[in-house]
Amino acid sequence: MAKAATTLKTASVLAFERKLANSDALMYAGNWAQQDNWTAIAIQEKSVRGTISNRLKNALTSDPAKLDAEIQKANLQKVDVAALPFGADTLKIVFTLRVLGNLAQPSVCNDQDYQTALGDIITGYAQEQGFSTLAARYAENIANGRFLWRNRVGAEAIRVVVTKKGERSWEFNGEDYSLRQFSQPAGDLAALTQAIEKGLAGDASALFTVEAYVQLGNGQEVFPSQELVLDEKARNGKSKILYQVNDVAAIHSQKIGNALRTIDDWYPAADEAGPIAVEPYGSVTSRGKAYRQPREKMDFYTLLDNWVIKGDVPMPEQQHYVIATLIRGGVFGEKGE
């Protein structure tokens, strides 16, 4: 057995499909006191004359006359915006989430020996640790409305309703849960955790509809995802293009998924930075930082290879991280020289 372990190599082709399969999130407007009448939020176009506020060259800032001439230039912009109507004070965001099992079976693997060894490790984790820890964190990120992103900031009230198809629903006050630390699930949160856990374990079908209600105030701006448009012709002169689905303002499925998997507080600087999205190198692009550096042997690939190839079992917290990365999905094969 030991000899087999030493000859085992990482598969050159290895991929996992994501096990938290969420949809885009659509955005609607209504009123907190009357939550049975919702209208789709449309993207509007706005043309504005902005000010010159970017950092200027020293040659301009050191010469008052040149600076005055520069700031007098018109900074004309055409942008997309989205907002609640003045007759509505509440934003409703809706998406669906399908939780898939069969994690031990990669979608692609070109090395049968490696696939068997990796499958044994995943099965062993499921038997010894179970998916309860990960499921509880995914559930809490639904309950706290983390997926609302900027739409959550400054809200008067947040209500999240989760419905499991054909069964029951759970209701949460988003402000009861922290974004910085995770709690011990109880009540409805424990029930939602159990439903997600069964989905990850492959014991039951798990399809959820998530509806979040955010009281912001009449006419307040809301924040769909922003599109990355590389073709200048497609931009049509706009400096900001917002995402929409069938003329309804929306948030990208990738952004929703990023929020749901923001459960990693097992990395070295977690006390300072808080939970981050599960990523192979702990990358947070908004901060320009990778929190799981290979030199510290805390990145996904080092932990996975040591676990599968060398038989070095990580600490339980890092086991959760490795399994969560596989749940995230991706292409993890060893790159050729």
UniProtKB/Swiss-Prot annotation:
Q: According to the UniProt entry, where is the signal peptide?
A: none
Choose any GO biological process term that the UniProt entry carries and state it: defense response to virus
Reported induction:
Expressed in late exponential phase (other phases not tested); part of a large cas-CRISPR3 polycistronic operon.
S-S bridge residues: none
Record note on biotechnological use: If the spacer DNA has a perfect match in the chromosome then toxicity results. Suppression of the toxic effects occurs via mutations in the CRISPR/Cas machinery, or via target deletion, which might contribute to genome plasticity. This CRISPR/Cas system can be used to remove genomic islands, and possibly other genomic regions.
Sorted UniProt keywords: Antiviral defense
Coiled-coil portions: none
Question: What assembly does the database describe for this protein?
Answer: Probable multimer. Part of the probable Csy ribonucleoprotein complex with cys1, cys2, csy3, cas6f and crRNA.
Task of the protein: CRISPR (clustered regularly interspaced short palindromic repeat) is an adaptive immune system that provides protection against mobile genetic elements (viruses, transposable elements and conjugative plasmids). CRISPR clusters contain sequences complementary to antecedent mobile elements and target invading nucleic acids. CRISPR clusters are transcribed and processed into CRISPR RNA (crRNA).
As for family, the record states:
Belongs to the CRISPR-associated Csy3 family.
According to UniProt, the name of this protein is CRISPR-associated protein Csy3
Give the species this sequence originates from: Pectobacterium atrosepticum (strain SCRI 1043 / ATCC BAA-672)
Task: Specify the taxonomic lineage.
Answer: Bacteria, Pseudomonadati, Pseudomonadota, Gammaproteobacteria, Enterobacterales
Q: What gene name is given for the protein in this entry?
A: csy3
